[in-house]
Amino acid sequence: MAKDVFAVPIFFICFRECVETSIIVSVLLSFIKQTLGQEQDATTRKRLIRQVWWGVAIGLFISVCIGAGMIGAFYGYGKDHFASTEDLWEGIFSLIASVIITIMGAALLRVTKLQEKWRVKLAQALEAKPLTGGTFKNNLKLWAEKYAMFLLPFITVLREGLEAVVFIGGVSLSFPATAFPLPVFTGILAGVAIGYLLYRGGNQASLQIFLIISTCILYLVAAGLFSRGVWYLENNTWNHVIGGDAAETGAGPGSYDIRQSVWHVNCCSPLVNGGGGWGIFNAILGWTNSATYGSVLSYNLYWIAVIVWFVAMRHKERHGRLPVVDPLLNRLRGRKSAEPGNGEQDVEVSTIPSDLQTESKIPKSGASLV
C-alpha cells in the first residue's frame, strides 16, 4: 500500500519546516553576495558564507541528535512524553526568532544607502577581537557581532528541526517505519529547491529590488512567528488546564479554549495530519484555524510596533533627533551626570561616536530607508 511507503503528513511537515529555513538562509546568502560582491571582499564574503553554513550544520546536527532520542522514546514508550513541554519551547523559540529577524530586516533596508559602510562593518565583525577583560555584556555583544551570520540560521534550523521532529513523532505511531524515508527526503528536497530559486532570484535582481522584496518576506515571517509564539504559550496553558495535549483531540471541541477564542474552524488546521497546504501558510504567514485574543492582538501590535519604529528611524535620519525620546534621554543623562562621583563617566556618556555623527549628517535627499 502507498501508506506503507509514503506518509503524506510526514512530507508536508518536512516541506513546511524546510521552506521556512530555506527562506532565511537564501536571503542571508543573497544579502552577503550582493553586499560583498566586489573582488576585494572575496575573503570576507567567504568567511561570512561559512558562518551561515556552520549555523545551518550545527543547528541541524543538534536537532537530529535530540530528534533521534525523542523518536526512540516515542517508539520505546508508545506515547508522546514530550507534548507537555512542546508548546512552551515552541513559543520561546518563535519569539526569539521573530525579534532577530525584525532587527535583521531593518538592517537590510539600510544597505543601499550605506553599502560601503556595511562592507567595512562586515569586515570588522570578523576581525579578531579580545572577548575577555571586559564586562559580560560587552563580551556577549562582541561575540554576537562577530558571529551574527551564524546565530540566525543556527536558531532557525534548530527551532524548525526540533519542531519537525516533534510533529513527526506525534504522527509516527500511526505509520510503519518504512513510510518515513521517502517523504522526509522529498519534503526536504522540495523545500531546498524553493530556497535555491529564491537565492538565484535574489542574485539576479537589482540590490534595491532584492532588499525590498526579501525584507517584506522576512517581516511577514517574523509577524507570523511572533503571533505563533504567543499562540503556543497560550496553548501550553490550555494543555495544563485540560491535563493533556489538546492537539490529540483533533480540530473540534476540546482542542481550544473557547474563552480566549476569536475564531475557530474545524477544518484548515496546520497541526492535524501534517497540515497540508495550511501548514505551509502557518510556517510562512502564521495562519491558524483557531485564533486567540493573544495571537490576533500580538500580530497587529507587531505591525504597529514595526511601523512606529520605521517612522521614528525616518524622522531621526531627516532631523537628527527623536522628538520625545531624545529629550527624555538627555534629561536622564543630565541627572546622572549631576550625581557625585560620575565626573569621569560624563565625558563617556556625552561623547557621540563619529560614525553616528556621520549618519546624522546624511542629506535629506538620501534619507529614505531604501
Swiss-Prot record:
Please give the chief subcellular localization of this protein: membrane
Localization, per the record, is: Cell membrane
Induction per the UniProt record: Expression is up-regulated during iron starvation and is controlled by the GATA-type transcription factor sreA and the Zinc cluster transcription factor acuM.
Per the record, membrane topology reads: Multi-pass membrane protein
Does the keyword Ion transport belong to this entry? yes
Q: Which UniProt keywords apply?
A: Cell membrane, Ion transport, Iron, Iron transport, Membrane, Transmembrane, Transmembrane helix, Transport
List, in alphabetical order, the GO biological process terms annotated in this UniProt record. Answer: cellular response to iron ion starvation; iron ion transmembrane transport; reductive iron assimilation
Source organism, top-level taxon: Eukaryota
Q: List the residue ranges of the region (Disordered).
A: 335-370
Q: Which GO terms describe its molecular function?
A: ferrous iron transmembrane transporter activity; high-affinity ferrous iron transmembrane transporter activity
Composition bias of kind Polar residues appears in: 351-360
Disrupted-gene phenotype: Does not affect the virulence in a murine model of invasive aspergillosis. Displays an 8-fold increase in external siderophore triacetylfusarinine C (TAFC) production after 12h of growth in iron-depleted conditions.
| Pfam families with a match to the protein in the record | FTR1
User: Where exactly are the transmembrane stretches of this chain?
Assistant: 5-25, 52-72, 88-108, 148-168, 179-199, 206-226, 293-313
Task: Answer whether the UniProt record assigns the keyword Repressor to this protein.
Answer: no
Q: Which cellular components does GO assign to this protein?
A: high-affinity iron permease complex; plasma membrane
Signal peptide positions are none
Which purpose does this protein serve, as stated in its record?
High affinity iron permease; part of the reductive iron assimilatory system (RIA), a siderophore-independent high affinity iron uptake mechanism.
The entry's family comment says: Belongs to the oxidase-dependent Fe transporter (OFeT) (TC 9.A.10.1) family.
Identify this protein by name: High affinity iron permease ftrA
What organism does the record attribute this protein to? Aspergillus fumigatus (strain ATCC MYA-4609 / CBS 101355 / FGSC A1100 / Af293)
Lineage in the entry?
A: Eukaryota, Fungi, Dikarya, Ascomycota, Pezizomycotina
Q: By which gene is this protein encoded?
A: ftrA
